[in-house]
Curated annotation (Swiss-Prot):
Subcellular compartments: Plastid, Chloroplast
UniProt-listed Gene3D superfamilies: 1.20.89.20, Nitrogenase molybdenum iron protein domain, Proto-chlorophyllide reductase 57 kD subunit B
Residues noted as binding [4Fe-4S] cluster in the record, renumbered to the chain: 36
Active-site residue list: 293
Quaternary organization: Protochlorophyllide reductase is composed of three subunits; ChlL, ChlN and ChlB. Forms a heterotetramer of two ChlB and two ChlN subunits.
PANTHER family named among the record's database cross-references: LIGHT-INDEPENDENT PROTOCHLOROPHYLLIDE REDUCTASE SUBUNIT B
GO MF annotations in UniProt: 4 iron, 4 sulfur cluster binding; ATP binding; metal ion binding; oxidoreductase activity, acting on iron-sulfur proteins as donors; oxidoreductase activity, acting on the CH-CH group of donors, iron-sulfur protein as acceptor
Organism: Porphyra purpurea
Binding site for substrate: 428-429
UniProt cross-references to InterPro entries, sorted A to Z: ChlB/BchB/BchZ (IPR050152), LI-POR_suB-like_C (IPR013580), Nase/OxRdtase_comp1 (IPR000510), P-CP_red_C (IPR042298), Protochl_reductB (IPR005969), Protochlorophyllide_Rdtase (IPR016209)
EC number(s) on file: 1.3.7.7
Name of the featured protein: Light-independent protochlorophyllide reductase subunit B
Gene assigned in the entry: chlB
One GO location term (cellular component): chloroplast
Free-text cofactor note: Binds 1 [4Fe-4S] cluster per heterodimer. The cluster is bound at the heterodimer interface by residues from both subunits.
Length: 507
């Protein structure tokens, strides 16, 4: 556990609650003190959803600490079973309530005697995993529970006559998740592949027994769904694809993988004509990447940071499809470091694996890229440094839960990404012209560091002179001047010192 005012991935119970609240008729009981129960507010604010968040907090208070939790937890489970009539109730502690070391499995066993619904305890180690790992594990746990139940009842499922697919990993609060799933459905329709099930978003737990009817499983995001796909592969020999169809190249690779699996299973399909037609005529990004507009971005410096799936995909797109120089890319998914490094090998100068936003901020300041592609935190950092930022990954705020159709996957997603990339760069002398003519976004000279450094002061005259320098080189001038001042052991940067630094650099 660590104290932080910003986390890229939240605590484990948030991942469990995201999966639970994605299913239909599943209710989650969160065994937690006040302060850990912010999920309801967060989901209600961000998700464009008409329904209430199906999560109830069983509050750990002084009475619970004195008498124990069993009576209260069991009462909350049975009460919600009567009121909501769910198919499944999931009990999850938080990292805080886990300290009590209570036998929650015993509470679940006791409650399940009195309830119509199934009752499960989320099998997650709250000290060792984060939100993303917990969501992956919880989804696998729920699927396993209902598949084992179906086996014990001798429920056998046959494969569908036509090729079909399960889409695994559509989770509440995902980044452009609903739009991506809609685009994937459209893609599979074009390929004449039936959708067997989409889980967990709007799925019923009673339908999970039909998952093996599909010919294969499709996992668009590594963060949630991979463990479920591996379980189904092991138990039912179901092949799965985990190549994210993001960008022209990876979308084609993903479709060819589908073609290979279907042909191996007895179908006869050839999607090469479809790939060619979509790439050349339907997707706008292929010709746009060869246009003079996009060629203006060739060699521009960018950095990428986000979850493993999105950061790896965007890095590939910037380098392969748009000719943009990626100075470094990184992910906060430290547990997936090996896969991430393999995916971005040769597409960037350096790989950063960290969940420390302070380190990431300082690296961005030092790199001085023309554009940032990251999370909500990188957007904040970009605003402080006056560097434009395109948001490409969770965690995000409400701007990235749009009502309009904005997928990142499939061929329509390539258009969305091309727009985002192009519009994220400050073009030509735009920044300088805004300052000259008193534009809407005139800013004072900003520091090129995020970490606090109060050892140097600028005189009013020096600040005024610095503000006259065009924005696209101002940061470099400021950094060189401050380096010169430190070398000279000066604490105050004056106009004279600025000119001395300029002469030193010029020579």
């Amino acid at each position: 556990m660590k104290l932080a005012y910003w986390m890229y991935a939240g605590p484990a119970h948030i991942g469990t609650l995201r999966v639970a609240s994605s299913f239909k008729k599943v209710h989650a009981i969160m065994h937690a003190p006040l302060g850990d129960d912010y999920f309801n507010v967060m989901r209600s604010m961000l998700e464009r959803d008409r329904d209430f968040t199906p999560v109830t907090a069983s509050v750990v208070d002084r009475h619970v600490l004195a008498r124990g939790s069993q009576e209260k937890v069991v009462e909350n489970i049975t009460r919600k079973d009567r009121e909501e009539k769910p198919d499944l109730v999931i009990l999850t502690p938080t990292c805080t309530s886990s300290i009590l070391q209570e036998d929650l499995q015993n509470f679940v066993s006791r409650a399940s005697i009195e309830t119509e619904a199934d009752v499960l305890l989320a099998d997650v180690n709250h000290y060792r995993v984060n939100e993303l790992q917990a969501s992956d594990r919880t989804l696998e746990q729920i699927v396993t529970f209902y598949m084992e139940k179906a086996k014990s009842n001798n429920i056998l499922t046959k494969k569908t006559i036509k090729p079909s697919v399960n889409i695994i990993g559509a989770v509440s609060l995902g980044f452009h998740n609903q739009h991506d799933i809609a685009e994937l459905k459209r893609l599979f329709h074009d390929l004449d592949i039936q959708i067997n099930q989409v889980i967990p978003e709007n799925a019923s737990v009673h339908d999970l027994k039909n998952l093996p009817s599909a010919w294969f499983n499709f996992v668009p995001y590594r963060e949630t769904g991979l463990m479920t796909a591996l379980y189904l592969k092991k138990e039912f020999n179901m092949p799965y694809i985990d190549i994210t169809p993001m960008g022209i190249v990876q979308t084609a690779t993903s479709i060819r993988s589908i073609q290979k699996i279907l042909n191996a299973l007895g179908a006869t399909v050839n999607y090469e004509k479809y790939i060619d037609e979509q790439t050349r005529f339907i997707s706008q990004s292929a010709w746009f990447s060869r246009s003079i507009d996009c060629q203006n971005l060739t060699g521009k410096k960018a950095i990428v940071f986000g979850d493993a799936t999105h950061a790896a995909a965007i890095t590939r797109i910037l380098h392969q499809e748009m000719g943009i120089h990626v100075a470094w890319c990184g992910t906060y998914c430290k547990y997936d470091e090996e896969w991430f490094r393999e995916q971005v090998k040769g597409f960037c100068d350096e790989v950063i694996i960290s969940d420390d936003h302070g380190l990431i901020g300082d690296l961005i300041a030092k790199t001085e890229p023309a554009a940032i592609f990251g999370t909500q935190m990188e957007r904040h950092i970009g605003k402080r440094l006056n560097i434009p930022c395109g948001v490409i990954s969770s965690p995000v705020h409400i701007q990235n839960f749009p009502l309009s159709y904005r997928p990142f996957l499939g061929y329509e997603g390539t258009n969305q990404i091309a727009d985002l990339v192009y519009n994220s760069f400050t073009l030509g002398m735009e920044d300088h012209l805004l300052e000259i003519f008193g534009g809407h976004d005139t800013t004072e000279a900003l520091s090129v560091g995020i970490s606090a450094d109060d050892s140097l002061n600028w005189s009013d005259e020096a600040q005024k002179e610095l503000s006259k320098i065009p924005g696209f080189v101002r940061g470099k001038v400021k950094r060189n001047t401050e380096k010169f001042a430190r070398d000279c052991s000066k604490n105050l940067i004056t106009l004279e010192l600025m000119y001395e630094a300029k002469e030193k650099v010029s020579s």
